[in-house]
Amino acid sequence: MARFEPYNYNNGHDPFFAHINQNPELINLDLPASTPSSFMLFSNGALVDANHNNSHFFPNLLHGNTRRKGNKEESGSKRRRKRSEEEEAMNGDETQKPKDVVHVRAKRGQATDSHSLAERVRREKINERLKCLQDLVPGCYKAMGMAVMLDVIIDYVRSLQNQIEFLSMKLSAASACYDLNSLDIEPTDIFQGGNIHSAAEMERILRESVGTQPPNFSSTLPF
């Protein structure tokens, strides 16, 4: 092995050359100068071969590199995890979307979601019922407004109820006084006997209940 005599740098200002003077065996000239491993590294005033383990001389550099690598890997894993979560969320939304949407061909200006469709069906049913009521109730028109139209319908129904009650009361009174099916009175008995008052009362009840003129018994009499 060829060795150079240490060059004496006695200036005392450069610790690099002072360390070389104290340790001349660090200089290795056996390796060819053209190879990258023949270069010497300097750390903390000491020359070392690039082929040797430099973890003792560069602990901060190695730890910094590992720390940066760990941070990069951690950030990359976080990004991948976040991207996978976003993709799963998007896939879940795509799978749930066809269940919520009702595929109905709507007209222009009309919505296609289920709530709007149900509301539209309800309004159509209400309009149909109102048209039926307009045909049944006299004096009921859609132009007068919903509230006024409902008031007219209510008044008409109440009037019908009152008429039904009144007619039922008159019919019950007439049936209580006279049983027309079992009435066995001759016309001669009515005018010859004392049943004239009863005949007049029967005519009055029939006129009120039926609304027509009762038959004239005197025209059928022979005298």
Curated annotation (Swiss-Prot):
Q: What is its main location?
A: nucleus
GO CC annotations? nucleus
Q: Which PROSITE patterns match?
A: BHLH
Expressed in which tissues: Expressed in leaves, stems, and flowers.
Q: Which GO biological-process labels does this protein carry?
A: positive regulation of brassinosteroid biosynthetic process; regulation of DNA-templated transcription
**For the region Disordered, what residue ranges are annotated?**
58-100
User: Which positions fall inside the bHLH domain?
Assistant: 110-160
Q: Which InterPro entries match?
A: bHLH_dom, bHLH_ZIP_TF, HLH_DNA-bd_sf
Give the CDD domains listed for this entry: bHLH_AtBPE_like
Q: Which Pfam families match?
A: HLH
Q: Any idea which GO molecular function terms this record carries? A: DNA binding; DNA-binding transcription factor activity; protein dimerization activity
The record's keywords, sorted A to Z, are:
DNA-binding, Nucleus, Transcription, Transcription regulation
What compartments host this protein?
Answer: Nucleus
Q: State whether it acts alone or in a complex, and with which partners, per the record.
A: Homodimer.
What name does this protein carry?
Answer: Transcription factor bHLH75
Q: What is the species of this protein? A: Arabidopsis thaliana
**Classification lineage:** Eukaryota, Viridiplantae, Streptophyta, Embryophyta, Tracheophyta
